[in-house]
Structure formats: C-alpha cells, structure tokens
Amino acid sequence: MGGEGGADDSVVHFVFVHGASHGAWCWYKLTTLLVAAGFKATSVDLTGAGINLTDSNTVFDFDHYNRPLFSLLSDLPSHHKIVLVGHSIGGGSVTEALCKFTDKISMVVYLAADMVQPGSTSSTHDSIMTVGEEDIWEYIYGEGADKPPTGVLMKEEFRRHYYYSQSPLEDVSLASKLLRPAPVRALGGADKLSPNPEAEKVPRVYIKTAKDNLFDPLRQDRLVEKWPPSQLYILEESDHSAFFSVPTTLFAYLLRAVSFLQL
C-alpha cells in the first residue's frame, strides 16, 4: 500500500483515465477514498478534456489525445506499482498506454470500458456510441459542414438517462457544467493498435455496470468473452458512471483487485 516509505518501497499508485467528454474531475470521490486509505491516486485530463486548454476540435490523432497520460506514466518512479483504471471509451487509452509502458504497469482495470485485445479486428467504439434509434449525440464540425465532424457531445436532454440514471443529482449538476466535446476522429485510433503479447501478460480486471443505459451490459459480457480478464466484478446497482453512483462499492472492488498484486 502507498505511503511515505523509502525510495525502494513498493507503492500502489492508481491512475484514472476518463471517458468521452469527461475529465479528471469525475474521479474525485474515488481518489479521495483511495488517498484516505493510504494509496496514491492520480486522475489525468486527456488532451482537450477537463482543464486541458487544447481545443478538442484540433485533436485528430489518438497519440495526441493520450499524450498527457503518456507524460504522466513516463515520469512516475519505477517503485510505483501502477494500476491503470479506464472508463468507457477511455479503455482504449489505457490499452494503448499498456502497450507503450508494459514494464511499468502492474494491472489494468476496465470500468464499463472498451476492452479490446491489441491487434483485434473487433471494435467497441461504435457499440458504446450507438444507442438504439435515438439521436443522442451532437456533432461539432470544426472544419466546416462539408468535412467530417471534429467533436461529439451527448445532447443535454439525454445525459441523465444514459450517463447518470442512478447518480446523485448534485453530481449530474456538476457534470453539466464540465462536460466538453470529445475529439471524435482521435478516438477512432483506439481500434488500430498492433498485437502485443507482452502487454497481454499484465493482469486485467473488468468491472461491469449492470444498470448501464449507455453501454449495454450484454455488450460488456461480449467483451469479457472475447478477451477474458483475470478478474471480473459486477456493480449491480451502477449506471454508466460508477464513480458517481456507487463509489464506495467501486472502491471496495478496486481494493479487492489489487490485493492479488505481489508487492
């Protein structure tokens, strides 16, 4: 467990990666619980998200989008046991980070996230973004209406149902002030990772959200079947945003997951 030990003492360090339109801010409950329990916990704003000043309409490359995460990981000391936690489409970001920083990462946790094996031809990008027949997404055309969209944001009237159906109203209100368009072109790069056998040796955990109106639990099951993780947990009362709706249960599952790490 993390603490103020010597430079060679192992420290469990959770690094949280948000999904589309969210930012480091959405993990405030989890990071508070983990730090109080003696762990290190860091949440990162990807390019164009949260308080990162980049205009998301200018982010076209997946590496560019993930650059703040890569910078953070490269700076962390070797005695930190890094546990990457990715939410929703942020699962693609943590998978790319796993492939680039395999030797530094001790575990990867996918929370209602796209968990696709590097080199696979399957994609969950569309499965998360497509919900029934409703037009729930607003597209931004930063280069003009005659060019492909540069950004995407869920329409305000749908957010409560799809993102936060079980979450406290104060968190819904907070999110309404902080959500930003996601760089839709950059996110397509999550499907283009090369096979990486070494990265596949790192323990993976999947946490399913059973009352998720955005990422159908049955689709989450298919991800688990295609690329089975070493641990599987189910948040029975969680919407898509477990960090808001069931933070204490999620916290308990994270503690259970890392208890299997060899420190």
Curated annotation (Swiss-Prot):
Localization (cell) = Cytoplasm
Biological function? Involved in chlorophyll degradation. Specific for the pheophorbides of the dihydroporphyrin and tetrahydroporphyrin types. Chlorophyllide a, pheophytin a and the nonfluorescent chlorophyll catabolite (NCC) are not used as substrates.
The active site lies at: 88 (acyl-ester intermediate), 212 (charge relay system), 240 (charge relay system)
Q: How is its activity regulated?
A: Inhibited by methanol and phenylmethylsulfonicfluoride (PMSF).
Primary residence: cytoplasm
Enumerate the UniProt keywords alphabetically: Chlorophyll catabolism, Cytoplasm, Hydrolase
InterPro entries the UniProt entry points to: AB_hydrolase_1, AB_hydrolase_fold, MES/HNL
* Other facts noted in the record for this chain: An additional type 1 isoform with the same enzymatic activity seems to exist.
Tell me what turns on expression of this protein: Up-regulated by senescence.
Q: What does the record give as the reaction this protein catalyses? A: pheophorbide a + H2O + H(+) = pyropheophorbide a + methanol + CO2
Ranges of residues in domain AB hydrolase-1? 13-244
Give an example GO molecular function.
Answer: pheophorbidase activity
Q: What Pfam families does the annotation carry? A: Abhydrolase_6 (PF12697)
Q: List the SUPFAM superfamilies.
A: alpha/beta-Hydrolases
Q: Which GO terms describe its cellular component?
A: cytoplasm
**UniProt-recorded name of the protein:** Pheophorbidase
Q: Which family does it belong to?
A: Belongs to the AB hydrolase superfamily.
Group of enzyme by EC: hydrolase
GO terms under biological process = chlorophyll a catabolic process; jasmonic acid metabolic process; leaf senescence; salicylic acid metabolic process
EC no. given is 3.1.1.82
Q: How does activity depend on pH?
A: Optimum pH is 6.5 for the native enzyme and 7.0-7.5 for the PPD-GST recombinant enzyme.
